[in-house]
Amino acid sequence: MFPLLGLFGGTFDPIHKGHLALANELIQKLPSLTEIQFIPSRQPPHRPSPLASPANRLEMIKRAIANQPNLILNDVEIKGNDISYTINTLKILRPLFLTHALCFILSTDAFADFKHWHQSSVILEYCHLIVVNRPNYRLPQQPWLSDLLSHHQTENAEDLGRFQFGKIFFQTLSPRPISATQIRHYLAKGDYEIVAPLLPKTVLAYIKAHKLYQQ
């Protein structure tokens, strides 16, 4: 059996308690998943540029995951100078973790757009996909999606450790409708009390100290 290494990509603009809860619950529900690496993107392919700088986003993640040994910061995409394509990241990481099964973590709505990812046809040659539920979201009925799942989906979590790549596993998690977009909206207006329950204290303190996301 291969130990599982979780790869959690995103802008983390800013990282919030929903991100942390997702990672920790995944580790609880998948015992073979002993580590999740947070991989902030420099420039996501299908989204606007993050508002916070790469350096600020890295620092916020460091503060958010401090004292949580199962959660690790990986700056591989921040070090790049181009668009942060998942396939390029996987090609860098695969040789570094030859004894692990890489598990790329994504939401159901991101998975519904998987066909349009850069070199999506070869991504599953490098990793598994762990698709986590998003509140009140159902996958669209698309022929390409049905075909992909018929070849790669497994309902047995142990398959993620039996193979190093090529499986798609759906994991149901507790609903956490926290939106970074909404958080930025309130931060722009200086409504710190509203966002305080949604952000780690150390992250909110950093945002205040550096006046991030202000209009």
From Swiss-Prot:
Pfam families: CTP_transf_like (PF01467). Catalyzes the reversible adenylation of nicotinate mononucleotide (NaMN) to nicotinic acid adenine dinucleotide (NaAD). GO terms for molecular function: ATP binding; nicotinate-nucleotide adenylyltransferase activity. It comes from the Bacteria. It comes from Coxiella burnetii (strain Dugway 5J108-111). Keywords: ATP-binding, NAD, Nucleotide-binding, Nucleotidyltransferase, Pyridine nucleotide biosynthesis, Transferase. It is an enzyme of class 2 (transferase). Pathway: Cofactor biosynthesis; NAD(+) biosynthesis; deamido-NAD(+) from nicotinate D-ribonucleotide: step 1/1. Belongs to the NadD family. NCBIfam families: cyt_tran_rel, nicotinate (nicotinamide) nucleotide adenylyltransferase, PRK00071.1-1. The lineage of its organism: Bacteria, Pseudomonadati, Pseudomonadota, Gammaproteobacteria, Legionellales. This is Probable nicotinate-nucleotide adenylyltransferase. The gene is nadD. It catalyses: nicotinate beta-D-ribonucleotide + ATP + H(+) = deamido-NAD(+) + diphosphate.
